[in-house]
Every structure is written in structure tokens, then in C-alpha cells.
Regions:
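Short, solvent-exposed helix-to-loop capping segments enriched in aromatics
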Residues: 19-33, 48-59, 127
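Glycine-rich portal/gate segments that line the openings of hydrophobic small-molecule binding cavities
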Residues: 38-87, 96-100, 134-150
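Beta-strand elements of well-folded, non-transmembrane domains
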Residues: 10-12, 57-61, 107-111
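Beta-strand/loop substructures that line and gate deep hydrophobic ligand-binding cavities in soluble
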Residues: 78-134
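Generic structural detector for well-ordered beta-strands
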Residues: 7-11, 66, 91, 108
Length: 150
């Protein structure tokens, strides 16, 4: 499995962060490339719950995320899209000024045939890491707004 990740310090506690992260109605404000929700099961955000969403035209296409873990320090989903499949995890540990957060994606490419490794090394991993960083930056803005309102 390949891996891309981003880190930040955010002003909310881990439970507050996971509540915000799993609120699909808020995703347009922070998830990179999110255009619209197509489907959401009643069990979301519990394990087995699923959301299907569509990206902007220049994005990932149709994305399906199924919750695989919702523990005290992490929220993980199995991610399926045209170009890859993998596990996305938001981890949060308490810190003096909120939480230390890591957003990671462990993935396998489903395209590029025998050139997968080269494509990943030269283009894909960096693009994914940059997208995770942008998502985490926008999530930080949402977390700061959430803190201000509480």
C-alpha cells in the first residue's frame, strides 16, 4: 500500500473534531473537490455507514466512503473511486491547544497498469498529499469557526 498524509494542530478536542469531520453537510466547505452528496445511509457515521458523493468536474468522480472504524482517537473510511481504493483515516490526539491531527490515505492505484509505481512516485502521491493538506487547512478554518461559536 502507498501512503500520503498531512498534519496540523487544530483548536478542538478529538470528540469535537470527529463530530465536525463526520458531518457530511459540512463537507462542501472543507473536503477537496466535493461537489454534492448522492447517497447517505442512516447508519452514518457508525461502522458500516456509507456516503456516496461526486466531485467537481476536474476531480475524483464518484467516491464511496464506508466507515470502518470510529474509535476514541480515529475515524477511518474505506474509500473507492475510479483511480484508487484505500483507507482514509483522521487521527486526533489531545494537545494543550486542542488536538494534534493527522489525515492519511493508504491506497492502491487501480489505473496506470505496469507504470503504477512510477506514476505514483512522480505525480500521484504528491497530488494526494497536497489535496490532503488543502482539506486539512480548510477543516482548520471550520474548526476555528466551530470553536468561536461554542
Amino acid at each position: 500500500m502507498r501512503r500520503a498524509s498531512a498534519r496540523a494542530t487544530l483548536p478542538l478536542t478529538p470528540p469535537e473534531l470527529f463530530r465536525l469531520w463526520s458531518d457530511v453537510e459540512r463537507w462542501p466547505s472543507f473536503v477537496e473537490g466535493f461537489a454534492r452528496r448522492l447517497e447517505l445511509t442512516e447508519t452514518w457515521p457508525e461502522p458500516g455507514g456509507r456516503v456516496v458523493w461526486e466531485s467537481t468536474p476536474d476531480g475524483r468522480g464518484r467516491v464511496t466512503e464506508t466507515v470502518t472504524e470510529r474509535a476514541g482517537d480515529r475515524f477511518s473510511t474505506q474509500v473507492y473511486e475510479e483511480a484508487l481504493a484505500g483507507t482514509q483515516t483522521l487521527r486526533a490526539l489531545p494537545a494543550s491547544d486542542g488536538s494534534e491531527v493527522e489525515l492519511s490515505l493508504e491506497y492502491e492505484l487501480s489505473r496506470y497498469g505496469p507504470l503504477r509505481g512510477i506514476a505514483d512516485m512522480l505525480f500521484i502521491r504528491r497530488a494526494l498529499r497536497d489535496a490532503l493538506r488543502r482539506t486539512l487547512r480548510r477543516f482548520e478554518v471550520e474548526a476555528e469557526e466551530e470553536e468561536r461559536l461554542t
